[in-house]
């Protein structure tokens, strides 16, 4: 049956790519669908597995999956939209890709490691498709529109869950930590556009949805980091220039804080009330297990198999991780320790460089044209990447395809928008030089005329 699904997958790609080629005016709808499906592919199972049978695997990738997001990305690339990706992005991703591939040679179960290679290949595909789409200035906001609606839709489900008595809600994502981490990729660039004065009404749903997720999620990391990121973004945006929109947002933010703070504190208090008091620190135990694994395997144990090695190798036992399914089947709650354990410190470093490269490039270009909406979005994307990088010190969920899809989209937007701004700045500089040259030539002509 999976081959039938794959056949239809190919047919849809062919039809959609032809539609994109033949209907340039309709392309924003395709970009919108890509942004929206990044939030809906997992909860509505808009995917199929080319290699089933991995459902009981202990790792975070459980097959050769293809999602609706991948289908749209394939169609965009097949439509013939051409645009070179910045070299620094290609090199950063290539380094990470090669290190992950090298981990397959030291893996206990090499085929499981190759599943993660497949997943990051899909991530690269999405990133390239977004970058090339940004050759059209309509693409970035269309993609952001889809992501904002997808996030807000999840936030509404969180409200419903909370109203029904759920202490913590993960919306449609299944877990509040995943929903909280994913919200950074969308809420912050949307807020940056709002602060910059963009007039699209739907943009307000971004920061509003992010605030709702903070309240209904009850996640300590999400609450602290999201509020800190909003404050940092507001400060940086104000440094770029003050306007009436920022004054209005500051007032609304104060009102929102007065309303939301008691709700968030109440959620956290209820969460801690039901938790049993104990001296056991599970996150610390996970980190001890990962540290021992890294010491024994400096080049890693293979992608997608931390939990296998942690249990079979006795690391969880020696680190004091309690004996139950939830704890022994969990990854270390720190993405950098997890990548270091699986792909070696080089793998962790390559991932850090991938994030740093994107964040720094976005921040750099956000100051080149401060009144340009593209620069404002880049500022939000930079803060979003930085916030996610810090959040990942307390979570492993960046390894899931749902989170990586949004990371790929944001990196693609950064690459595309940075290239646009770079070209605009170069074009303006060229125009100024030509204007100056024209004035000089005109002045010389006038001098000659007076001399004659």
Regions found by a protein language model. Give the residues of each.
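Long extracytoplasmic/lumenal interhelical loops at the membrane interface
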Residues: 274-288, 302-343, 366
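Transmembrane alpha-helices of multi-pass inner-membrane enzymes
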Residues: 354, 379-434
């Amino acid at each position: 049956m999976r081959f039938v699904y794959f056949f239809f997958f190919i047919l849809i790609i062919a039809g959609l790519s032809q539609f994109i080629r033949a209907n340039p005016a309709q392309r924003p709808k395709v970009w919108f669908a890509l942004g929206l499906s990044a939030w809906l592919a997992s909860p509505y199972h808009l995917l199929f597995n080319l290699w089933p049978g991995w459902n009981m695997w202990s790792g975070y990738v459980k097959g050769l999956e293809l999602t609706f997001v991948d289908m749209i990305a394939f169609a965009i690339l097949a439509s013939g939209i051409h645009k070179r990706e910045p070299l620094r992005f290609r090199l950063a991703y290539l380094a990470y890709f090669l290190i992950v591939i090298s981990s397959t040679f030291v893996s206990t179960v090499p085929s499981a490691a190759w599943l993660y290679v497949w997943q990051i290949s899909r991530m690269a595909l999405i990133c390239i498709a977004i970058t090339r789409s940004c050759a059209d200035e309509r693409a970035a906001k269309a993609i952001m529109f889809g992501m904002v609606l997808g996030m807000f839709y999840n936030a509404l489900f969180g409200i419903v869950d909370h109203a029904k008595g759920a202490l913590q809600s993960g919306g449609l994502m299944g877990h509040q930590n995943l929903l909280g981490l994913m919200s950074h990729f969308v809420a912050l660039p949307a807020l940056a556009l709002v602060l910059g004065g963009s007039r699209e009404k739907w943009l307000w749903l971004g920061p509003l949805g992010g605030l709702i997720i903070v309240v209904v999620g009850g996640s300590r990391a999400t609450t602290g980091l999201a509020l800190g990121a909003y404050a940092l973004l507001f400060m940086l945006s104000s440094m770029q220039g003050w306007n009436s929109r920022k004054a209005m947002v500051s007032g609304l933010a104060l009102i929102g804080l007065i309303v939301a703070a008691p709700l968030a504190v109440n959620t956290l208090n209820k969460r801690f009330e039901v938790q049993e008091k104990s001296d056991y620190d599970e996150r610390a135990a996970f980190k001890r297990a990962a540290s021992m694994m890294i010491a024994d395997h400096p080049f890693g144990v293979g992608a997608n198999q931390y939990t296998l090695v942690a249990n079979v190798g006795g690391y969880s036992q020696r680190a004091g991780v309690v004996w139950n399914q939830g704890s022994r089947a969990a990854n270390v709650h720190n993405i950098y320790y997890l990548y270091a354990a699986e792909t070696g410190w080089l793998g962790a470093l390559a991932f850090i460089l991938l994030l740093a490269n994107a964040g720094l490039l976005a921040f750099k270009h956000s100051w080149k044209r401060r009144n340009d909406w593209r620069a404002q979005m880049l500022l939000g994307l930079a803060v979003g990447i930085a916030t996610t990088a810090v959040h990942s010190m307390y979570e492993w969920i960046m390894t899931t395809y749902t989170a990586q899809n949004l990371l790929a989209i944001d990196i693609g937007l950064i690459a595309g928008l940075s290239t646009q701004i770079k070209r605009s700045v170069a074009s303006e500089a060229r125009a100024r030089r030509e204007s100056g040259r024209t004035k000089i030539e005109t002045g010389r002509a006038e001098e000659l005329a007076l001399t004659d």
